[in-house]
Regions:
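Glycine-rich phosphate/diphosphate-binding loops that line cofactor/substrate pockets in enzymes
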Residues: 104-112, 188-192
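Conserved, well-ordered active-site substructure
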Residues: 113-116, 126-132
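Short beta-strand segments
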Residues: 11-14, 115-119
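Active-site/ligand-binding loops adjacent to catalytic centers
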Residues: 3-89, 131-217
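Flexible, glycine/charged-enriched surface loops at secondary-structure junctions
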Residues: 86-97, 110-113
Length: 223
């Protein structure tokens, strides 16, 4: 933005682990990603200040235009492809953004450019085969098919063809609504000033009408 790249879109990306509780020992052993997943991405996007600092600088909704969700099997597939094609064996959590970019590239014009940055450490996770062996020992079904039928904690479905790798777009308005709800809860707010409204507009990258509508739903008085 500061460099004047106002036409550039910023995408976030996570592996879909919907339904698995991050604090559950049983669920923990049924997920093949301990980072780079929705169990971190969604809570920290909608409530950035619940981390171990008074005010977090990582405020994703200020900048993120879209949030792409990919499946476990898709990331394992891209991890193996990267290993075979480029000789780079890492991840799989460190290939989350690359998988989302691969899916996104299928939607864009051929002259458009995607810059991929893995915010997770690129060696995140054990060797893919070790992780898959452990998953199988925990009763997770491993198979090839439609990765969109992947159910976290139940199966891992690898695509039969790379064209099957398609990212899902998370509902950004839902994230932003949750952010405002959490911000209100943090300070037990019953009223909001013009400065508060301006702050929430900047935090959610939304217009005044959206912020006022959500605050009204939460019974917050504007003063």
């Amino acid at each position: 933005i500061r460099a004047g790249a106002t036409g550039t879109k910023i995408y976030g990306a996570s592996v879909d682990l919907t339904g698995l509780h991050m604090a559950s020992d049983i669920d923990f052993n049924r997920k093949s990603f301990t980072t780079g997943h929705t169990g971190f991405g969604v809570p920290y996007a909608t409530d950035p200040d619940h981390s171990d600092v008074p005010r977090s600088a990582a405020r994703a909704l200020r900048y993120m235009d879209n949030y792409l969700i990919v499946q476990q099997g898709e990331v394992f597939y891209i991890t193996e492809a990267l290993s075979i094609l480029e000789g780079m064996e890492r991840g799989p959590a460190g290939n989350t953004s690359l998988t989302a970019a691969f899916a996104l590239a299928q939607e864009l014009d051929e002259d458009q450019i995607i810059v991929v940055q893995e915010t997770e450490y690129t060696g995140a996770g054990k060797h893919p085969l070790a992780q898959l062996s452990f998953a199988e020992s925990m009763g997770i079904e491993l198979k090839f098919g439609d990765p969109k039928l992947d159910k976290p904690g139940v199966n891992i479905i690898f695509p039969e063809h790379p064209s099957q790798i398609k990212a899902t777009y998370f509902d950004m308005n839902r994230l932003k609504h949750s952010y405002i709800k959490n911000a209100v809860k943090h300070v037990n707010a019953t009223k909001a000033t013009k400065e508060d409204v301006k702050f929430l507009m900047e935090e959610t990258k939304m217009d005044k009408d959206f912020v006022l509508r959500v605050l009204e739903e939460l019974n917050i008085e504007i003063i």
